Structure formats: structure tokens, C-alpha cells
């Protein structure tokens, strides 16, 4: 598991997390180790598929795993991040970016999520891309 670089509120505790209140309803995004996410519909899944080696994607396809279509994969590669947005009263939007190691392999992804209403996709994309790049640099010993 890769942890993003610490922000000012987490410098004292490497296991800290951040939570907030939603003013108009309940929102819960609780992803624990072992949680399975769809590769075709989630920002995490789209990033992992888009930046994986072809043989990994081929193996998943052969196993019948639902994958994002070629148009989505091309867009994720072009942008350097993936989004998932679904409208509704209690839906969550997310932006994810790949963590690339020294061998130029995608070894994971970082994501930000929040309620669909008011979610600033562009701002969150900038934040998560920068955090993923910083995490990758740290893994390579550059920070």
C-alpha cells in the first residue's frame, strides 16, 4: 500500500485519515484493504487498466473481467488520470491517477472522492496527479 505524501494535518500521525461532514446528507466512502472495485466503472479501475501492461489486460479480458472500453482507456492515458461521476442524491465522484515506478510500471493508484454535488473534478485531478507523482518519486528515492 502506498500512502500519499503527508499533508499539514497528517504530519504528526502517519496513519491519519481525513473526514468531513456533508451538509445535505450522508456520504460514506469506506474502502478497506481487500475491497473489490469494478475496473470498468471506477476511477481506480480505469487507471489501473489504462496503465497496466498489455499482458495483464489480456489476462483479465480472458477471465471475463469487465474492462473500460478503448475510448475510455485512450482518454485516461491522454489525461493522465481517470474520473468516475454518477449523478444522484448520494453518489460519489472520484478522480484517480497512477503511481508509476522506476521501471515505468503502474504499481497502484491514488484517488480523491467526494459527493457529486460540488465536486471540482479539475481541481481534484490536479491534486491527485501531483500526489501520485510525489508518491512515485518517493518510491524511486527521489524525495
Residue map of PLM features:
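Histidine-centered metal-chelating micro-motifs
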Residues: 4-6, 36, 82-83, 94
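Juxtadomain coupling helices with adjacent low-complexity linkers
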Residues: 65-66, 72-74, 78-82, 90-91, ...
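Short, glycine/serine-rich, charged loops/turns that create anion-binding
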Residues: 12-14, 22, 99, 114-117
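Short solvent-exposed loop/turn micro-motifs enriched in small/polar/acidic residues
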Residues: 1-2, 90-92
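A cytosolic small-molecule/anion-sensing beta-strand core signal
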Residues: 11, 101, 108
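Short, solvent-exposed recognition segments
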Residues: 21-89
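A short, hydrophobic, proline-anchored segment that marks a local hinge/packing element in signaling
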Residues: 95-102
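Intrinsically disordered, low-complexity terminal regulatory regions
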Residues: 1-21, 123-132, 139-143
Amino acid at each position: 500500500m502506498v500512502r500519499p505524501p503527508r499533508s499539514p494535518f497528517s504530519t504528526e500521525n502517519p496513519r491519519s485519515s481525513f473526514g468531513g461532514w456533508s451538509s445535505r446528507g450522508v456520504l460514506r466512502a469506506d474502502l478497506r484493504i481487500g475491497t473489490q472495485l469494478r475496473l470498468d466503472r471506477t476511477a481506480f479501475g480505469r487507471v489501473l487498466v489504462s496503465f497496466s501492461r498489455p499482458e495483464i489486460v489480456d489476462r483479465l479480458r480472458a477471465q471475463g473481467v469487465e474492462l473500460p472500453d478503448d475510448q475510455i482507456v485512450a482518454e485516461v492515458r491522454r489525461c493522465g488520470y481517470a474520473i468516475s461521476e454518477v449523478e444522484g442524491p448520494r453518489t460519489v465522484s472520484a478522480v484517480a491517477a497512477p503511481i508509476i515506478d522506476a521501471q515505468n510500471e503502474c504499481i497502484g493508484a491514488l484517488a480523491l472522492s467526494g459527493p457529486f454535488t460540488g465536486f471540482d473534478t479539475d481541481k481534484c485531478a490536479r491534486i491527485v496527479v501531483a500526489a501520485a507523482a510525489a508518491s512515485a518519486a518517493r518510491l524511486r528515492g527521489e524525495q
